[in-house]
Amino acid sequence: MDNSVLQDAILNGLISTQYQGNALIGPQLLTNNQSSTIWQTLRHELLSCKNFTWSVAFITLDMLVPFKAVMADLAQQGVQGTIITSDYLNFNHPAMFEELQKIPNLTVRIADLNGFHTKGYLFDHGEYQTVIIGSANFTRSALLVNKEWNLKLSSRQEGSLFQQLTAELDAVKHESTVLTSEWIAAYRKNWQPPKTRVTQPEKLKPIE
């Protein structure tokens, strides 16, 4: 990708619409609405990336069904991914960790950090990187229905923002361990459902 294309797309989103925009790599505010969902953007980024690293606090079982289907396609292309998550507030169900562990081209790490509440999705496309950061956890409600705000930005690895992000991810990885069956067994033994849960909407959009 020519530097001028990426530069104009960034300037279009952050400085002035007089610059040439680009729907694929230009800065965007992602929300759930009648025409699109956050999950649709995540899915597109997954299917077009060379590898990815996510740092996300909460994950629900119902989102793993479409995610595992995408990961199966990526496995045929040799694409690997990493998810850093945690046991924060006991939100994540033990069965969710078991399902993640079944995905062969996915490395799952458990952050050993108090108050781990990140929601960041980094995709490496080779010539450029894309990050989605905002309010959405990897839950069906957040990615399909809820009023969520997430910023999508693309840049080169040499960009200051992405160097900061990479450094932060490296720091979180350093404070994490690889998910194991032993960890899941111990978590399941002590796990209790959270006393308060986010209310689920009555109707959820079908996952595409």
What are these model-predicted stretches?
Residues 1-208:
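PLD/PLD-like phosphodiesterase catalytic module centered on the HKD motif
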